[in-house]
């Protein structure tokens, strides 16, 4: 059995970075070093007082230390990691672009009063879960040792559990909506028409190449020649889901 340090080192880069940021943001809030009032999304504060960090920090606070926080962090560690190691194996730039597309979509939808959310971490995790469930629709999932179901239905089951435990329905539903929006334009529409409107931009490939984050097969951008190609920020090993 690998040690916690070895397990952490083996994680793919984007899921590792996002999960780490979510964990330490919650730790800082729990220690009262950070206050949630400085993190939540508030467009009047963003545009009138130029508190632009809120466009990012709203994605990193999942919940106070609780079962709800633990479940969401485990979803990143399990389903986000399996998605990045499986369907997005050797496609770090594509995975990063999915996260960026999801973040932008959530920020835009949050302008609409019906979809307004102060914290977008739970919608982002729900988006990852939805995309994973579409890529692996027939996997068997056991929920709390009580219910077994196909993974295709897992996002909806988690939505139902949110309602049962008294949480708001909207954050999870918002994540599912954005996840389907991504999956439609990235997978379903290209399969049906042969045309892709959600191709990973070259600047995302440049970020991955410049900072040597993970790996991108057939990248249009070459990484810098200097230094050891095995090093990098949040660099992890890649695995296939069906190994």
UniProtKB/Swiss-Prot annotation:
Q: Fetch the SUPFAM superfamilies from UniProt.
A: Rhomboid-like (SSF144091)
GO (cellular component) term, any one: endoplasmic reticulum membrane
* Positions on the Lumenal side per record topology: 42-55, 116-157
Q: Membrane topology for this entry?
A: Multi-pass membrane protein
Main localization of the protein described in the UniProt heading = endoplasmic reticulum
Report the locations given in the UniProt record: Endoplasmic reticulum membrane
Query: Where does the sequence pass through the membrane?
Result: 21-41, 56-76, 95-115, 158-178
Q: What induces it?
A: By endoplasmic reticulum stress.
Q: In which tissues is it expressed?
A: Expressed in roots, stalks, leaves, immature ears, embryo and endosperm.
Q: Which PANTHER family match?
A: DER1-LIKE PROTEIN, DERLIN
Additional free-text comment from the UniProt record: Associated with ER-derived protein bodies in endosperm.
Which family does the record claim for this protein? Answer: Belongs to the derlin family.
Q: What does this protein do?
A: May be involved in the degradation process of specific misfolded endoplasmic reticulum (ER) luminal proteins.
The molecule here is called Derlin-1.1
The gene from which this protein is expressed is DER1.1
């Amino acid at each position: 059995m690998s040690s916690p340090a070895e397990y952490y080192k083996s994680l793919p880069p984007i899921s590792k970075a996002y999960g780490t940021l979510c964990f330490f943001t919650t730790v800082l809030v729990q220690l009262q070093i950070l206050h949630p009032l400085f993190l939540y999304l508030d467009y009047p504060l963003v545009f009138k007082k130029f508190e632009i960090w809120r466009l990012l920090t709203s994605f990193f606070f999942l919940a106070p230390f609780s079962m709800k926080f633990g479940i969401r962090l485990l979803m990143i560690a399990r389903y986000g990691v399996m998605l990045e190691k499986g369907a997005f194996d050797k496609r770090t730039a594509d995975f990063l672009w999915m996260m960026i597309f999801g973040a932008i979509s959530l920020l835009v939808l949050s302008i609409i009063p019906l979809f307004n959310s102060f914290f977008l971490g739970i919608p982002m995790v729900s988006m990852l879960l939805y995309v994973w469930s579409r890529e692996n629709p027939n996997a068997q999932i056991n929920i709390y040792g009580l219910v077994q179901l196909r993974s295709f239905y897992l996002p909806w089951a988690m939505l139902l559990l949110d309602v049962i435990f008294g949480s708001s329905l909207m954050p999870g539903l918002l994540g599912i909506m954005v996840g389907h929006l991504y999956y439609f334009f990235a997978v379903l529409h290209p399969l049906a028409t042969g045309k892709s409107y959600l191709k990973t931009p070259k600047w995302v490939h440049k970020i991955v190449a410049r900072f040597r984050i993970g790996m991108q097969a057939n990248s249009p951008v070459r990484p810098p020649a200097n230094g050891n190609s095995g090093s990098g920020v949040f660099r992890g090993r890649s695995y296939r889901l069906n190994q």
